[in-house]
Amino acid sequence: MARVTVEDAVDAIGNRFDLILVAARRARQIAVGGKRPLVDPENDKPTVIALREIELGLVDSSSMDVIDREEQQHQEAAELAAVAAIVGGNQ
């Protein structure tokens, strides 16, 4: 298991409070959201993987916002397509 120094991750994000928010958000994406890790998992838990990604500069607050926006747009497009299919099927 790789050791992650939180200090390096804090330096990458700016402060420890934002680090907690970004790391928790990314760990949730990996654990529950089915997102692939950007680094080799090496049998690490999602929280450690998230911290390693942050430490390497692969993930930050703004990149998380972009990912969330893209996912929301994709979900909305899928919902609109489903509604269009239902409406089109009823005519």
Curated annotation (Swiss-Prot):
Its EC number is 2.7.7.6. GO terms for biological process: DNA-templated transcription. It comes from the Bacteria. It catalyses: RNA(n) + a ribonucleoside 5'-triphosphate = RNA(n+1) + diphosphate. Keywords: DNA-directed RNA polymerase, Nucleotidyltransferase, Transcription, Transferase. SMART domains: RNA_pol_Rpb6. Signal peptide: none annotated. Disulfide bonds: none annotated. The keyword Nucleotidyltransferase applies. GO terms for molecular function: DNA binding; DNA-directed RNA polymerase activity. InterPro entries: DNA-dir_RNA_pol_omega (IPR003716), Pol_omega/Rpo6/RPB6 (IPR006110), RPB6/omega-like_sf (IPR036161). GO terms for cellular component: DNA-directed RNA polymerase complex. Belongs to the RNA polymerase subunit omega family. The RNAP catalytic core consists of 2 alpha, 1 beta, 1 beta' and 1 omega subunit. When a sigma factor is associated with the core the holoenzyme is formed, which can initiate transcription. PANTHER family: DNA-DIRECTED RNA POLYMERASE SUBUNIT OMEGA. Promotes RNA polymerase assembly. Latches the N- and C-terminal regions of the beta' subunit thereby facilitating its interaction with the beta and alpha subunits. This is DNA-directed RNA polymerase subunit omega. It comes from Pseudoalteromonas translucida (strain TAC 125). The gene is rpoZ.
